[in-house]
């Protein structure tokens, strides 16, 4: 945490590119086609999208307080975000960055993963619990 850039490193040449992403990035995921980098910005409670070809920030949305971890659906249509101090998870549609759903998860959620086979969202809570939610919301 800290800073405002993501370092993209070419593993063949070790050349480094810097992507300006916003203050205090916490977690990142790539779109299924590797063209968009999604990141949580912990201090502002936002999720941002950066086009990797243009290196430009293209979308941003507030999801809660202290956005931490995130995951993406297998088809790339939705992001799932845990918001640590607001004790919630948010579902964001990637096409327009609309928050489709925000629900109480647990006290201080810190990790999240999307399970495509059964369309479930698994959430790790700071106190040690694991919560499982059905992703039944229509996209």
Task: Go through the PLM ranges and name each one.
Residues 1-139:
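Predominantly soluble domains enriched in secretory-pathway, periplasmic, or organellar proteins
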